Structure formats: structure tokens, C-alpha cells
């Protein structure tokens, strides 16, 4: 956190500067397999099971595997391509893959977290609870469906084209909890969902290919559409949306959106004014409804 100026100034340097070490333990088991038939058809798959002290103790989630499967078809090795005399087509391959990958947020813990400090005024020890325990802490999962193609023409032009859909679930986001538990009525839990759809194109052309010299031009383009599909907790104060945009999300918006008031100009006294949630022009200090702010970018 950020300490107040008075608090920081009055503390000795040895109390402010500190070094700490953080250690986590992992154990993994994985399996990979692949098979290619007649240099034309290929299948591959992988499975991985991982355990870490960052996961919760709930047995329902502890041993969920991450896995992927894929297939490819090397069209240029088919007889009908060779019989057609398509010498200009050096390589053309189609690919299809599907899999589930995982990510673990090391800022969260399945255990009750607290930090210890000494009061500036009483010199007494203070312990502040940070996060409640979470036995269901688990992977942030992303399922990816990808269709792609690779090609080479005339021995000089190479490229690839991919279309994908990525759906992320069990994302760590703020979740509403019983206010009587404390923690500002919210806690981080695997409760968010997000979707990405996009395309990627990559091209490369060899203008000059010599033993000791080459000249190549490359081109890449990509498009991605992102949307938050599920979030359990939405703030009730517009200021929270602007102060902490990376901790507060609105369903239907994009990830890491930035929010702002709709500016309505200056009042007769020179003070700034904005539009509230109903479109009325009022003083900026009076607007606290989250529906009064809009997404202005990322």
C-alpha cells in the first residue's frame, strides 16, 4: 500500500525499507502424444495435472486437468494436388485445435491473509486482515478453439492465417459477500467470465535469397474483440469505477476499460459540470451513480 506523508516522514529509514522473500511449491504430471500418417494427417494431444500451494483445498477443483487436442492436414502431399500440376504451391496445411489452459493469480491465497505493523502513535502491534480464506481457489481457465492454415507459394511467399475463439472462465474478480464478514462486503473469487474472438494474419516474402545475403519483407495484422460476459460484483459508487478500473468491471464492457463522466461544460461560476445517469446537468461532486460514467477506452 501507499503510506501517508506524515507517517512515512516520521518513521526511520530502517523501518520503511525492507526485503522479503516469497516461495511457492508446485508439482506437475503431464503427457504428450502425437501421430502422423503418410506425411498427410497428424493428430496430437496433451494432458497436464498440476498442484500448488496457491490452490484451495476443495477436492472438487484440486485435480482438474489442463488438456489440448489438435489435428492437421498437409494438403500438398495429397495425390490430387500433385496430379493437378500445382508446382507453384510448395506447402498448404490446415489446422484445427482445441484446448484448456490455466493461469493462477499469485496475489490471491486460499488462506486467511493479514499483515502486521506497528502503530505510529501507540507503538503497539497491529494486525490487519486482508483477504478471507478461499478453499475453492482454482485455475483461471481459458478454452481456445482455433482454425488455421499455413502456406508457401513459389518458394518465396510464406504465410499463416488463424481464426480463434477464447472463452475464459473462473476468472478472479471481486465477488459480493456477507457484509457482516467485513472486507468491505467483497472478496476475490473465481467468478468472472470473458470472451475473445479474433483473426491473425502473417505474411513474409523473400525478395533476395543468396548464400551470403537475403532480403525479406514481413507483414502482420490482427483483430480481437473482447467482452466481459460475467461479473458478480459491480461497484455502487462512480468514483470507484474511475479510481480502480482494473478492480471494478461492468458486464458487456471490454477488459481494462477506463471510465469517465460525460462532461457538460462549465457552469456560470466556472465550475465543471457533468451529466448524471438521467442526462441532467449537475455539479460533478453530486454524481455518484455508476450509470453516470461511460467507457472511454482501454
Regions found by a protein language model. Give the residues of each.
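Structural flexibility/helix-modulation signal
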Residues: 272, 276-278
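Long, low-complexity, polar/charged, intrinsically disordered or flexibly structured peripheral segments
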Residues: 278-297
Amino acid at each position: 500500500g501507499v503510506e501517508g506523508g506524515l507517517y512515512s516522514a516520521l518513521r526511520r529509514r530502517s523501518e520503511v525499507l525492507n526485503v522479503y522473500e516469497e516461495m511457492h511449491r508446485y508439482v506437475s504430471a503431464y503427457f504428450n502424444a502425437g501421430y502422423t500418417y503418410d506425411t498427410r494427417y497428424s493428430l496430437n494431444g496433451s494432458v497436464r495435472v498440476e498442484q500448488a500451494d496457491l490452490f484451495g483445498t476443495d477436492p472438487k477443483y484440486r485435480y482438474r486437468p489442463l488438456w489440448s487436442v489438435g489435428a492437421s492436414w498437409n494438403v500438398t502431399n495429397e495425390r490430387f494436388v500433385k496430379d493437378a500440376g500445382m508446382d507453384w504451391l510448395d506447402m498448404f496445411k490446415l489446422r484445427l485445435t482445441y484446448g484448456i489452459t490455466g493461469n493462477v493469480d499469485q496475489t490471491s491465497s486460499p488462506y486467511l491473509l493479514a499483515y502486521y505493523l506497528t502503530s505510529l502513535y501507540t507503538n503497539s502491534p497491529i494486525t490487519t486482515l486482508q483477504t478471507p480464506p478461499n478453499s475453492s481457489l482454482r485455475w483461471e481457465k481459458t478454452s481456445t478453439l482455433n482454425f488455421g492454415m499455413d502456406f508457401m507459394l513459389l518458394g518465396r511467399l510464406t504465410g499463416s492465417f488463424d481464426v480463434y475463439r477464447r472463452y475464459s472462465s473462473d476468472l478472479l474478480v471481486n465477488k459480493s459477500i456477507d457484509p457482516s464478514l467485513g472486507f468491505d462486503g467483497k472478496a476475490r473469487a473465481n467468478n468472472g467470465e470473458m470472451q475473445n474472438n479474433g483473426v491473425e494474419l502473417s505474411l513474409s516474402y523473400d525478395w533476395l535469397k543468396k548464400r551470403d545475403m537475403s532480403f525479406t519483407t514481413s507483414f502482420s495484422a490482427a483483430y480481437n474483440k473482447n467482452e466481459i460476459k460475467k461479473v458478480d460484483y459491480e461497484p455502487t459508487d462512480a468514483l470507484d469505477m474511475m479510481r480502480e478500473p482494473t478492480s471494478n468491471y461492468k458486464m458487456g464492457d471490454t477488459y481494462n476499460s477506463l471510465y469517465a463522466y460525460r462532461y457538460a461544460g462549465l457552469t456560470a461560476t466556472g465550475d465543471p459540470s457533468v451529466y448524471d445517469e438521467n442526462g441532467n446537468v449537475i455539479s460533478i461532486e453530486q454524481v455518484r451513480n455508476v450509470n453516470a460514467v461511460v467507457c472511454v477506452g482501454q
